[in-house]
């Protein structure tokens, strides 16, 4: 029932909050009044409240409160009853004249309409009365009969006084023909005005002025205060029926029908009642346009029903009207059947068991405002049944029920419902409360539902639902059941389940078909104790939503659905079960933004390619015994800018993913995790992307992240103050891949940070600080680490920081700084390790006393290790070595070792059976006991390094080499290093070439406390110094190490045994070696007929040194001879002794200078093996005198490089020749030496028990002798340089070397440039194409003669250096001085030249150039103007040459042959001319090639001359061929005698030039003059080069000068011919085009000539 007090007493209560007003709001008029048989008295408001209070609640306090304020209640009743507009009608009526004025404007009522008024009163009389106000009628039927008797259009006004008027049976009021009937209440004794509306007062004696207005209707029911018309039948057709303050009652089993016609009518009820009590039929019916239950719709209908301030009781309305308005009325047990009504409006009314039925497919609008609707029956009746086109609007109303419904309260099919400010209370339904289907729309605003005992609140299918502010409570209630794809919008919903959970939204169909989805939007809502959402093919959007569930089911179970949530909160207190807060399947999606997940267990589960995204959210207080987040089946999980706090996972992982799923975590904080038996993240066959993650203050019993066959990308991550007990932080298994960069690992207590097995890891820019434990453990993996920083880690690991086995690792910019280690820093076994830009500084490594373990910092076994561009600085290694390598390859390049300390027994670098390559490194300030680099049974390559201020208390300040081998050791600098022995290098069982080491490295200010400032070893050999004269008997013993250092570290005893052939017995002596020296007294000064055997043995701790020498009379120095009287003496001036005979031989003063001990060669001469009988002249300027070459590129060795024929570059990067290279550089280019200064123990190596020491000293005998020659004069040398100097030894040594591959002509290459091959190839092609075009006339042209001129000079000046480009004319690839294309010997280069000549010949004899030019011109005739005249002439003759092919072919072949004969002869003759030096014969052109036999090419050459020459050619060609052979032969044979060579060339050139000038073999005059001019130039060049002016010039300047001169002569010749001899005729008409077009004519002419 409507709250009347709320709607009518606003003026009294809107500003009053007193208890009285609260009581008024609490007690409302309800249907109990009518259930007890009473009829409502609108005036008796106060009594009604008292009745309700006394009957139900018996509240004494409220009862007495009512009594005290009874006057106020009465005033309220008056306000209610007079709140009508009845006064408007009374004012406009003339009651005295019985002619009230009609105030109704009825269509058609004007003009001739008759207005008839009648009065009806209980004091009237039907017989005597006339119906006026003074004589009214008594019964209603009297009035009915009168009205029915009228015809036409009339206006009837019936004024009825208070009373009960019952119609007899058959009394029916007929209102037809557009008539108007008004039933109006009136009272005769009351003065009515606008200021007093008290026409209807309650039955209270407190107001005596209104007693006459009451009339008693005594049927023991109630009192009626307005007229009551009982059981009146009404027939309304095309007319108007109006009730004002009139009650219509139908009861006492009376069958009553109020029927209306088809067309226009008005049915107005105002301040009246329609009441049906106990009729015969279940309901009283008012039928509007009901004809056989069919609908008749008239477009002209303008019918209207107005019900205002009235009561409708137990009626059924069937109406087809335009508008129905019910205002401030009460409808009891009434059914409204709207057929085609457009607007139904109910306002401020009360509905009791009232039903509204609307017809489908009609635009019917139902509006209910400020109403109250109560239902108490239990049946299958639907209150609101909405069809297509219907619209229902309920606002500011209350719906309440006490019964139990079997159907929905509101049912919509393709209709629209609006609920605004509505309350639903105490509903019991077996079906959903509201049912929407077939594109219906439901809009709910400010709806409150309490005590709802229904299966579902809303059932929706294929419709739209909008909820704004809904508060609902109930148990096990489904808020929305979705039966088909729909659109749902919910805001400000409060759903709270008390004891049993219910589902907010449930889908009761398989899902959307044909791509249709259910759209759900929920904002600003609260769900408490719910069961969960189960969605399929739906899209759910949440904003500012709070949800809590204690259900064992998932809060969200999604299948092929999407969930978008923002600013929402989700929680579940359940900690057991296998259900997740969010469960996704079949490509579902969850997107959470700014959400909170709290007090939950399992959070997310995704399967079948589903996606979860969390952004800006908080996950707090998670406690789970199972997996919290499970991602499988190709699904993805993304978390961005979120926080996970206080998470406890007992027995499973927090995140588990598998089956090609993706995990993305971006800008998230994981705080205070506690993980049990499983890792935080367990990834199987997944892709993991983590960046900007903060993991803080968490505890793990197992790993943090485990990747198995997965890919992990981690960046910008911070791991702070976490504890991992006994396991790894990151574990990679089974082909996994990890990329981690820009991260910080700080303050963590871990066992292993990264563990990788059969996987790949790339760790970049990671800082590892203040942690404990192993950083990386790798097995069968490939690791790349860059920009890593490890600093300030106290006791990082008790074992190692990095561990690799069977792995590959790359370190780039690794920083290990200020750490304290009790184990190895990096260990690698059977692995490959690369360090680039390593910084290892300020670290300390001590013995691990807890584990009884000594550990080097860097440990490498069976591995390949490279350290490049690195710094190892200021470290303290208290446990063994800083770097320890075993059976590995260690490469260190461009690195710095600075101020490292090894206080105990250890090395900076220790090598055991390793290969070390050290290049461009600085090792500075190493403080150690044993040394800087200790090498044991290893191989050393060290180049371009600096060892500075390294200090070792024992042996080897920089290197300690034990049984090791040096492959290369050059360009190293050892400065200010100190050690007890060998301040730079110490060797034990290792023998290095001291001379080579000293020469190719720099040693400065190194200081050994005992001996070996530069290089030292243990004592290895003994030297005995015998007296130089025959009178002295004191012999000195020197004890040396391998490098001729006096062993001055101890006292040694030497046992001497001398066998003297003079007495034929052994003589024993003993002496002491102090400071490396000792002596014994014995005379060996005898003549050569006697000999001695000296044996010396020194035994000391750890070694045994023996010396055995068969001594003969002393040998003389180089160039000395021996006599019995004078001994060794120098020969007279201009004489010197030869090594072979030992006799004085006269020196050739043109070649040598012989002045006692000063014996040296002059310019352009070279001496072999200090033998004055073996002095040879060098090619032009090749030897500079003093037995030296003119360039430092040559090898100075009289045997290996005779006459400066070999280059140093022949041995660069050639391992086969390394020993030969060392041998060559040990030889001294000086001319004298000392033969008696030292004797060493080389000959006694077999008798020494220490085989290593003896073999080493034997193999380095040359260097030992050489190192002791410092005390002699500059002329001293050692006798072992030539080892006897006989020819057999020379030949043996010479036969061991290979041809030189680093020469450009006679000179050494400075650089190698393969790109020079490209211009050479272009030249060969160009020259071949040129000969192809001019092959028929080339020898008779100026260009041909110039080419021959350049070819000849390229051969003549072959010995000169700095010739550029000229060599191309003899087809040589050495056309750029001091540059070589490749490393090739002379035979290989000649082969290339011969192949090039052959290719030029093949191209030249073809017609390829002519055909190519003609082909181009045929395609573009415009190009013919660009063709030079000389080429055009050859093209014009092309057809003639083709027709005379036999004759021209032979001539052209001969011309090409003449153009190539000079380079061809030079190549062939250079291969057959020998040069003998000593007993060895070399190829004259290259002394590094041994001469074998005459090449077979020369046979083919002479055969070709015979075959190609025919009588028809001129005899002058034979002279040219002869001249070519002569010049070429002289250039090779006289190569080593330049003066004779150039003189012979001058004579030959004079004869040839004169013959050509005198006999004039050239038929063409202009060519005759050109040839004479070229001959003149050639003769002048040959004469000038042999002058003293040229020979006194700089050697390198001569070649450049003559290159310029030769090409200048060629240019002058061309200028002479073109401008000074004869002007070329201008050919105006180009006949080339005619030649191409008229080819057929030319062929005809040729045939005619034949």
From Swiss-Prot:
It is a multi-pass membrane protein. The lineage of its organism: Eukaryota, Amoebozoa, Evosea, Eumycetozoa, Dictyostelia. It is found in: Membrane. Residues 197-216, 1218-1296 are annotated as: Disordered. One of its GO terms (cellular component) is membrane. This is Transmembrane domain-containing protein DDB_G0287209. The keyword Transmembrane applies. InterPro entries: Pectin_lyase_fold/virulence. It comes from Dictyostelium discoideum. It comes from the Eukaryota. Keywords: Coiled coil, Membrane, Transmembrane, Transmembrane helix. Residues 194-225 form a coiled coil. Residues 1224-1284 have a biased composition (Low complexity). The chain crosses the membrane at residues 1314-1334, 1347-1369, 1390-1410, 1454-1474, 1489-1509, 1515-1535, 1539-1559, 1570-1590, 1595-1615. The keyword Iron-sulfur does not apply.
């Amino acid at each position: 029932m409507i709250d009347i007090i709320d709607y009518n007493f606003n003026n009294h209560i809107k500003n009053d909050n007193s208890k009285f007003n609260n009581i008024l709001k609490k007690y409302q008029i309800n249907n109990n009044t009518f259930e007890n048989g009473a009829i409502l008295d609108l005036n008796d408001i106060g009594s009604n409240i008292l009745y309700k209070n006394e009957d139900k609640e018996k509240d004494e306090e409220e009862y007495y409160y009512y009594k005290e304020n009874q006057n106020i209640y009465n005033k309220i009743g008056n306000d209610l009853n007079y709140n009508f507009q009845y006064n408007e009608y009374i004012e406009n009526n003339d009651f005295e004249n019985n002619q009230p004025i009609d105030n109704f404007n009825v269509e058609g009522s004007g003009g001739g309409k008759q207005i008839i008024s009648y009065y009806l009163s209980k004091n009237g009389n039907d017989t005597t009365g006339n119906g006026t106000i003074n004589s009214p009628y008594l019964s209603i039927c009297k009035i009915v009969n009168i009205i029915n008797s009228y015809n036409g259009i009339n206006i009837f006004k019936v004024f009825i006084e208070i009373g009960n008027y019952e119609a007899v049976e058959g009394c029916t009021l007929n209102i037809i023909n557009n008539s108007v009937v008004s039933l109006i209440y009136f009272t005769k004794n009351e003065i009515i005005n606008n200021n007093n509306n008290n026409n209807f007062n309650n039955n209270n004696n407190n107001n005596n002025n209104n007693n006459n207005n009451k009339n008693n209707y005594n049927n023991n029911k109630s009192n009626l205060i307005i007229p009551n018309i009982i059981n009146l039948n009404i027939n309304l057709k095309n007319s108007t029926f109006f009730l004002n303050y009139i009650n219509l009652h139908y009861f006492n089993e009376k069958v009553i029908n109020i029927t209306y016609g088809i067309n226009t009518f008005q049915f107005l009820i105002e301040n009246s009642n329609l009441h049906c009590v106990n009729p015969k039929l279940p309901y009283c019916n008012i039928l509007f346009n009901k004809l056989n239950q069919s609908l008749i719709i008239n477009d002209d209908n303008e019918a209207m029903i107005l019900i205002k301030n009235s009561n409708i009781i137990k009626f059924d309305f069937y109406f087809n009207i335009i508008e129905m308005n019910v205002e401030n009325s009460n409808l009891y047990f009434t059914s409204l059947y709207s057929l085609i009504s457009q607007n139904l409006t109910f306002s401020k009314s009360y509905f009791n068991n009232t039903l509204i039925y609307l017809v489908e497919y009609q635009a019917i609008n139902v509006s209910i405002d400020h109403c109250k609707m109560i239902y108490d029956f239990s049946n299958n009746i639907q209150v609101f049944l909405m069809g297509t086109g219907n619209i229902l609007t309920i606002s500011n109303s209350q719906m309440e029920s006490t019964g139990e419904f079997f159907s929905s309260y509101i049912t919509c099919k393709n209709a629209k419902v609006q609920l605004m400010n509505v309350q639903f209370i105490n509903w019991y339904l077996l079906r959903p409360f509201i049912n929407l289907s077939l594109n219906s729309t439901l809009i709910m605003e400010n709806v409150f539902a309490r005590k709802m005992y229904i299966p579902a609140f809303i059932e929706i299918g294929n419709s739209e639902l909008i909820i704004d502010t809904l508060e609902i409570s109930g148990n096990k209630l489904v808020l929305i059941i979705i039966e088909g794809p729909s659109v749902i919008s919910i805001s400000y919903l409060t759903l709270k389940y008390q004891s049993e959970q219910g589902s907010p939204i449930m889908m009761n169909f398989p899902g959307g078909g044909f791509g249709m989805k259910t759209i759900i939007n929920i904002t600003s809502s609260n769900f408490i104790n719910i069961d969960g959402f189960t969605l399929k093919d739906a899209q759910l959007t949440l904003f500012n939503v709070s949800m809590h569930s204690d259900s064992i089911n998932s809060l969200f179970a999604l299948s092929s659905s999407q969930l978008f949530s923002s600013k929402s909160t989700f929680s579940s207190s359940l900690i057991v079960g296998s259900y997740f807060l969010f469960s996704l399947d079949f490509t579902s999606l969850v997107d959470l933004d700014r959400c909170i997940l709290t007090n939950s267990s399992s959070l997310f589960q995704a399967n079948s390619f589903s996606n979860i995204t969390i952004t800006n959210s908080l996950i707090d207080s998670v406690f789970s015994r199972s997996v919290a987040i499970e991602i499988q089946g190709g699904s993805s999980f993304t978390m961005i800018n979120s926080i996970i706090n206080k998470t406890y996972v007992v027995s499973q992982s927090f995140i588990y993913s598998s089956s090609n799923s993706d995990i993305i975590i971006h800008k998230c904080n994981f705080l205070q995790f506690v993980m049990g038996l499983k890792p935080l993240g367990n990834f199987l066959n997944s892709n993991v992307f983590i960046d900007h993650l903060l993991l803080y203050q968490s505890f793990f019993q197992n790993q943090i992240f485990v990747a198995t066959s997965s890919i992990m990308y981690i960046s910008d991550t911070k791991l702070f103050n976490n504890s991992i007990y006994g396991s790894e932080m990151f574990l990679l298994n089974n082909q996994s891949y990890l990329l981690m960069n820009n991260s910080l690992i700080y303050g963590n207590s871990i066992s292993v940070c990264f563990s990788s097995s059969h996987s790949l890891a790339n760790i970049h820019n990671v800082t590892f600080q203040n942690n404990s434990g192993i950083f990386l453990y790798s097995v069968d993996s490939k690791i790349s680490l860059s920009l890593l920083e490890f600093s300030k880690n106290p006791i990082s690991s008790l074992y190692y920081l990095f561990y690799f086995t069977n792995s590959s690792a790359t370190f780039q910019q690794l920083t290990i700084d200020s750490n304290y280690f009790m184990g190895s820093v990096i260990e690698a076994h059977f692995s490959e390790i690369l360090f680039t830009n390593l910084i290892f500084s300020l670290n300390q490594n001590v013995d691990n006393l807890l584990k009884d373990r000594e550990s080097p910092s860097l440990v490498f076994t069976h591995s390949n290790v490279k350290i490049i561009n690195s710094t190892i600085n200021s470290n303290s290694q208290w446990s063994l070595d800083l770097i320890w390598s075993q059976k590995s390859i260690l490469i260190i390049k461009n690195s710095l070792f600075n101020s490292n300390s090894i206080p105990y027994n250890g090395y900076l670098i220790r090598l055991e059976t390793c290969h070390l390559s050290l290049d461009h490194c600085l090792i500075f300030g190493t403080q150690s006991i044993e040394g800087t680099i200790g090498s044991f049974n290893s191989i050393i390559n060290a180049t371009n390094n600096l060892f500075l201020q390294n200090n070792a208390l024992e042996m080897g300040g920089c290197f300690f080499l034990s049984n090791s081998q040096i492959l290369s050791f050059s360009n190293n600098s050892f400065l200010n290093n100190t050690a007890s022995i060998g301040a730079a290098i110490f060797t034990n069982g290792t023998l290095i070439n001291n001379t080579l080491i000293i020469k190719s490295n720099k040693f400065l200010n190194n200081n050994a406390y005992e001996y070996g400032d530069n290089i030292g070893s243990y004592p290895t050999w003994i030297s005995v110094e015998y007296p130089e004269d025959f009178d002295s008997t004191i012999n000195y013993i020197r004890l040396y190490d391998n490098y001729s250092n006096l062993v001055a570290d101890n006292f040694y005893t030497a046992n001497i045994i001398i066998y003297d052939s003079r007495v034929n017995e052994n003589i024993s002596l003993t002496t002491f070696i102090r400071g490396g020296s000792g002596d014994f007294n014995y005379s060996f000064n005898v003549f050569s007929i006697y000999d001695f055997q000296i044996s010396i043995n020194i035994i000391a701790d750890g070694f045994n040194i023996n010396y055995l020498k068969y001594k003969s009379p002393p040998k003389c120095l180089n160039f000395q001879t021996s006599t019995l009287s004078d001994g060794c003496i120098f020969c007279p001036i201009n004489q010197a002794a030869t090594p072979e005979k030992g006799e004085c031989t006269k020196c050739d003063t043109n070649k040598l200078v012989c002045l006692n001990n000063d014996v040296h060669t002059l310019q352009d001469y070279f001496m072999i093996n200090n033998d004055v009988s073996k002095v040879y002249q060098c090619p032009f300027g090749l030897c500079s005198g003093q037995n030296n070459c003119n360039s430092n590129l040559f090898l100075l060795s009289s045997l290996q490089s005779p006459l400066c024929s070999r280059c140093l570059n022949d041995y660069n990067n050639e391992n086969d020749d390394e020993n030969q290279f060392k041998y060559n550089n040990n030889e001294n280019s000086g001319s004298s030496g000392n033969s008696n200064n030292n004797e060493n123990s080389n000959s006694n190596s077999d008798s020494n028990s220490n085989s290593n020491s003896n073999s080493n000293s034997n193999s380095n005998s040359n260097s030992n002798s050489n190192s002791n020659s410092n005390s002699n004069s500059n002329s001293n040398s050692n006798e072992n340089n030539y080892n006897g100097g006989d020819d057999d030894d020379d030949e043996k040594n010479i036969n061991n070397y290979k041809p030189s591959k680093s020469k450009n002509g006679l000179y050494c290459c400075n650089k190698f440039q393969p790109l020079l091959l490209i211009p050479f190839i272009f030249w060969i092609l160009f020259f071949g194409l040129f000969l192809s075009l001019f092959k028929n006339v080339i020898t008779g042209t100026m260009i041909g003669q110039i080419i021959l001129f350049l070819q000849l000079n390229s051969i003549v000046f072959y010995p000169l250096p700095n010739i550029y480009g000229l060599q191309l004319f003899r087809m040589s690839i050495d056309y750029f001085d001091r540059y070589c294309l490749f490393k090739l010997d002379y035979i290989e280069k000649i082969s290339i030249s011969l192949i090039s000549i052959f290719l030029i010949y093949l191209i030249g004899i073809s017609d390829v150039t002519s055909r190519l030019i003609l082909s181009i011109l045929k395609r573009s005739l415009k190009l013919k103007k660009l063709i030079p005249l000389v080429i055009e002439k050859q093209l014009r003759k092309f057809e003639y040459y083709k027709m005379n092919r036999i004759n021209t072919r032979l001539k052209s072949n001969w011309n090409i042959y003449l153009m190539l004969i000079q380079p061809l002869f030079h190549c062939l003759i250079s291969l057959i001319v020998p040069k003998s030096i000593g007993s060895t014969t070399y190829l004259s052109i290259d002394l590094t090639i041994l001469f074998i036999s005459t090449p077979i090419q020369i046979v083919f050459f002479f055969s070709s001359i015979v075959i190609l020459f025919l009588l028809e050619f001129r005899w002058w060609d034979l002279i040219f061929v002869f001249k070519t052979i002569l010049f070429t032969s002289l250039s090779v044979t006289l190569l080593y005698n330049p003066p004779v060579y150039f003189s012979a060339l001058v004579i030959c050139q004079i004869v040839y030039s004169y013959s050509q000038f005198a006999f004039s073999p050239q038929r063409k005059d202009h060519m005759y003059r050109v040839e004479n001019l070229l001959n003149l130039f050639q003769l002048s060049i040959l004469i000038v080069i042999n002058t003293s002016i040229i020979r006194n010039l700089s050697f390198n300047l001569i070649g450049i000068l003559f290159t310029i001169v030769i090409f200048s002569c060629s240019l002058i010749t061309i200028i002479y011919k073109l401008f000074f001899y004869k002007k070329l005729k201008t050919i105006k008409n180009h006949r080339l085009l005619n030649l191409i077009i008229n080819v057929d004519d030319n062929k005809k002419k040729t045939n005619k000539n034949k």
